[in-house]
Amino acid sequence: MEKSGRESDGAPCGPVLHIVVVGFHHKKGCQVEFSYPPLIPGDGHDSHTLPEEWKYLPFLALPDGAHNYQEDTVFFHLPPRNGNGATVYGISCYRQIEAKALKVRQADITRETVQKSVCVLSKLPLYGLLQAKLQLITHAYFEEKDFSQISILKELYEHMNSSLGGASLEGSQVYLGLSPRDLVLHFRHKVLILFKLILLEKKVLFYISPVNRLVGALMTVLSLFPGMIEHGLSDCSQYRPRKSMSEDAGPQESNPSADDFTSESTSDVLNTSLETVTRVMAVNHGEDAVPKTEKPYFQVEGNNNKGQEPSDSGRYLELPPRPSPESSESDWETLDPSVLEDASLKEREQMGSDQTHLFQKDSLPSDSPPITVQPQANNRQVVLIPGLISGLEEDQYGMPLAIFTKGYLCLPYMALQQHHLLSDVTVRGFVAGATNILFRQQKHLSDAIVEVEEALIQIHDPELRKLLNPTTADLRFADYLVRHVTENRDDVFLDGTGWEGGDEWIRAQFAVYIHALLAATLQLDNEKMLSDYGTTFVAAWKNTHNYRVWNSNKHPALSEINPNHPFQGQYSVSDMKLRFSHSVQNSERGKKIGSVMVTTSRNVVQTGKAVGQSVGGAFSSAKTAMSSWLSTFTTSTPQSLPEPPNGKP
C-alpha cells in the first residue's frame, strides 16, 4: 500500500505530502507525535524532529486557545522545503477528549483532557475538500480512543493521493467551504474596501476567534480575486531573509546593484532578435555574482553557497539554501521595472554608453515590452523573457495578479511564535489572520485590522482611509451586490449554489470589476473612467508591484473588455442615500449620529405608545362613565314619579 502513494525515488506522487499528528505535551508544549511519511527522510514515524523551514508547524496545527473549543479547523501556509517548489498548504482538524475516556492512557498524559490535531500537508490549495475528508477521519481517529492506532492515518494518506491524484484546480471544488454570500451578508459594502486594500498590497490583519471563522473569512476575500486561490498563492509564504541582524535597521526595500545581476555581453544580445525570446545562451556566474555584505531580495547565488544557512536562522519563515531553478525563476520574474532601470544606469557607468542599450526601454520598439535576463541556477544559463512575468499560471487577462510574490505574505493563521514576521524588514506586506489579542494590540505593525466579528475595518492612516473611500460608482456596485444577496438569503433552494446572488455570481461580478479597471488603465484620456474607481486609488495602485508586473506585458483579450466602470452614471437622489448610509456606518461621527437617531426614534415610538394608551384610556373611561350615568338616569326616572292611586293623575 505504501508504494501506491509514492514514486520510486520516495517522493509523493500525489498532492498530499504528509499526514501529521500534533499533540500537546504538559512539559514540552505542542509537538509532532506522528508523521507519515516521516517529515525528515530516514526518521521514524514517531520522530519529533522538524525541518527548520517548518518549525512553526506544531503551533499552527494546534492554535492558541484550542482548549476553549471542543473542535476546530485551521488553514495555514508553510514555505517549501529547501527553497524548492511552491507553498505547502496545511489543513488541520483538532479535537479534545477527556483522558478518562481513553482505552489506552499513556504515561505522559497527566491532564484531564487530551488535545490532538490531525493535519494534511498538500501541494494543492483544496482547503474545503481536504477539510471535509479530514474531519471525518479525525472523528474516527478519536473514536478509537487509542492514539497508537495509526493505521487509519496511513490509509488516509493513500486514499487522498489516489482519489486526488488527477485533481484539477479548475471548477467549484477549489472554492468548497468559501462562501462570498456569507461574506457580503456580513461585511456588506465593506467587501469592496477589503478588495481594494489587498490590491494596494497593504499590511492587513484579520482578527476573530475561533480559527475556522478567521481562515474562512480571509480565504473567502481572496477567492474574489480571479485565479488567486487556484494559482496565485504558490509564492505567498516565501521571502528572502537578511544575513545579519544589523541589516534590519536599513530601509525596507533597496534596489539591488548591477553587480547583483547576471548580464549578457552586448554582442550576443545584438545578434538576438526580440522575437527569439526563448533562446538560451550560456553564461558563467561564479563567486563574483554573490554580494559580500548583503543578501538582497533577489540574488543569483553561486555554487559556493550550497548547503549554507543564515546565521540567524531562528527568526525566519524560510531558510533557503542555494536556490533551485524554480526559486531562482520566481525571484527574477517578480522584479519591477525600476530595478532594471537602476541596473542599466550602473552598467552605463561601468561598461560605457555603447553597452547600455540592453536594458534601456528607449532602444526597444515602442510596441515591445522590456526585456529581462532570467538566470537558471542549475545549468548556468539565462533565458531572455519579454516583459516581467509573475511566475504564476495566468489566464488571457493576466490573472491572477502577482500580489503574493516578492515578500508579500499570505498567512491565513499566524501563531504567536511568528509575531516577528510582522516587523521583519524583508516582508513587504501581508494578509494574515490571528486569534491572539496581542496581534490586535500592536496596531503599528499593520495598516489595517479587520475585526471579523463586528465587520469592522480599522484603517490607521487617515490618508489611506481617504484613498479607499468608495466612489459613487463603487457604492452602486456594492449596493447591487448586497441587494441581490439579501433578496435571496431566505431561499432554501439557493443555498449559495444558484446563479444570481449566489457564490459564483458574486465572484463573476468582481471579475468584471477588476477586468474593467485594468482595461481602463490602458486607455488614453482615461481620467473620467478612472475617476469612477477613485483617481487617487488608481494612482497608488499603479505604484504597486502587482500592477507593474501586469502592465509590463500585453493582454490582447482586454481589448474586448468595456473599460468603463460597471456602474458609471449620473449622480441621483438614490446616490445621496447611499452616500449618507455609507457615512453613517463608517465614520465615528456618523455612528454617533446614527446611534442618537435610533435612540430618539425608539423613545418617540415608546412615548407615542404611552400617550396613545393614556389618551385612549381616559377617553374610554369618560365614555364608560357617561354611559353609566345615562343608564342610571333612564332607569331611575319611573321610580321618582310613582303612579297616583286609582289610576288618575
Swiss-Prot record:
UniProt-listed PANTHER family: LATE SECRETORY PATHWAY PROTEIN AVL9 HOMOLOG, LATE SECRETORY PATHWAY PROTEIN AVL9-RELATED
Region called Disordered, residue ranges: 239-267, 283-336, 348-377
Protein name (Swiss-Prot/TrEMBL): Late secretory pathway protein AVL9 homolog
Keyword Transmembrane helix belongs to the record: yes
Keyword field contains Ribosomal protein: no
Record PTM Phosphoserine, positions in chain: 244
GO CC, alphabetical: membrane; recycling endosome
Domain uDENN: 17-161
GO biological process terms held by the UniProt record: cell migration
Modified residues (Omega-N-methylarginine): 589
Biased composition (Polar residues): 301-311, 352-377
Function of the molecule: Functions in cell migration.
All copies of domain cDENN, residue ranges: 173-341
Composition bias type Basic and acidic residues, residue spans: 285-295
Boundaries of every dDENN domain copy: 343-594
Matches recorded under InterPro entries: ABL9/DENND6_dom, DENND11/AVL9_GEFs, Tripartite_DENN
Membrane topology: Single-pass membrane protein
Entry keywords, A to Z: Endosome, Membrane, Methylation, Phosphoprotein, Transmembrane, Transmembrane helix
Localization, UniProt: Recycling endosome; Membrane
Protein family per UniProt: Belongs to the AVL9 family.
Ranges that cross the membrane: 204-229
Disulfide cysteine pairs (residue numbers): none
Primary location class: other
